[in-house]
Amino acid sequence: CMGIDFLVSADWHIRGDRPVCRTDDYMEAQQKKIEFISNLAGFHDCPILVAGDFGHRPMWGDRLLNWFISRNSKVERPHIIAICGQHDLPNHRLDKWEEAGVGVLSKSIENFEVAHNDFNYDNRIQIHTYPYGEKIQCFTESARKINIAMVHQMVIKSQDDKLWHDQKADHAKRLLRKFPCYDYILSGDNHQSFVVEHEGRYLINAGSLMRMSANQIGDLPSVYSVDIRKNSVERVYLPIEKDVISREHIDVAKKRDDRIDSFVNRLNESYDIDFDFEKNLEEFFTKNKVNEKTK
C-alpha cells in the first residue's frame, strides 16, 4: 500500500443536473474530481471509503447511470466502499437501497461496493458500517486490530462550529470519547472538511466532493489519506477551478425579497388593519363608490 492504507471521502452527491450556483460544465467537474481520487488510490493501491450520500437523489436515471458506469467501471479502478446516506435511499428506507442508483452501481461495477454489514477488509482492518438511520455503537467483538466506523450522521467539529444557531448534533470529540473502541470514525453528511484527534484516535469528516451551494465558495474539497502504521492522517486537496460559483441567484432572490418587504410596508402604512368586520366594511364603503343596492 506504499504507506497509505485507505482514502476517506464522503458526500459525492453525483448528479446529472447543474446546481443553481455553478456556471461551469458540472458533469465534467465531477469527473475530474473522481479521476483525481481514483488515480491517487490507484497509485497507493488502496480503497476509497465514502461515508454516505454517494448520489444526490435515490433514483439516478438511465442517462446519469450510463455516464457514471461507462467512465468508472474499468477493471483497474480502485475499490470504492460506500455506505448509504439519506440521499441514496428511496423514502429514506435502508431496506430499499438495492432499488436505488447505488444498487445499480453495486451490480454493474465490480469494484464498487455498498457496505451494509460489518466486515473484515483485510487481516488488520474490520469496518463497521452505520448507514443513514443506524446509530453508531460499540461492537461486542472484533477479530481485527484496527477498527473503523463508517457513519452517515451530522457531526460538527466542535460545539463552537454549529451550522446554525440552535443546531443539535454530536461533535467530533464527543463521539471519539463515547466510542473508544474505534481507531477511526469516518463521518458523512456535514459538507465541511475537518479531522479531530483524541488520544491517538481520529474522527475524519471529509466533506463534500463538490461545492454545490454559493456558501461553499471558500471551501477546499478534499480527501484524507490514512497511514495506519504511522497513525497519520493527511489532507489532500482536490483540484478546483476559480470563478465557477455565482451568487447571482442569491442576489436576485434578495432583491425580490426586498421588493416584497417594501410592498408590505407600504400596505401597512396605507391601511390600519382592523379585525372589526363591520368597521372594515364601513371604511371600504366610505373610500370607494358603492351603490346602495350592493350595500
Model-inferred region functions:
Residues G3, W12, P19-D118:
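Core catalytic region of metal-dependent phosphoesterases/phosphodiesterases
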Residues V8-A10, I48-D53, H79-H87, E113-N117, ...:
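Active-site neighborhood of phospho(di)ester-bond hydrolases with catalytic His/Asp-centered motifs
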Residues I14, H56, V155, Q192, ...:
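Short, glycine/acidic-enriched loop or turn micro-motifs at the edges of active sites
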Residues R15-D17, C21, E35, F68-P78, ...:
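Catalytic phosphate/metal-binding cores of nucleic-acid and nucleotide-processing enzymes, i.e., regions
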Residues D25-I37, Y184, S213, I217-D219, ...:
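Cap/insert and terminal regions of metallo-dependent hydrolase folds
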Residues W67-F68, S73-K74, I81-L175:
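Conserved catalytic scaffold of divalent metal-dependent phosphoesterases
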Residues L163-K230, R235:
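Conserved beta-sheet core of the metallophosphoesterase superfamily
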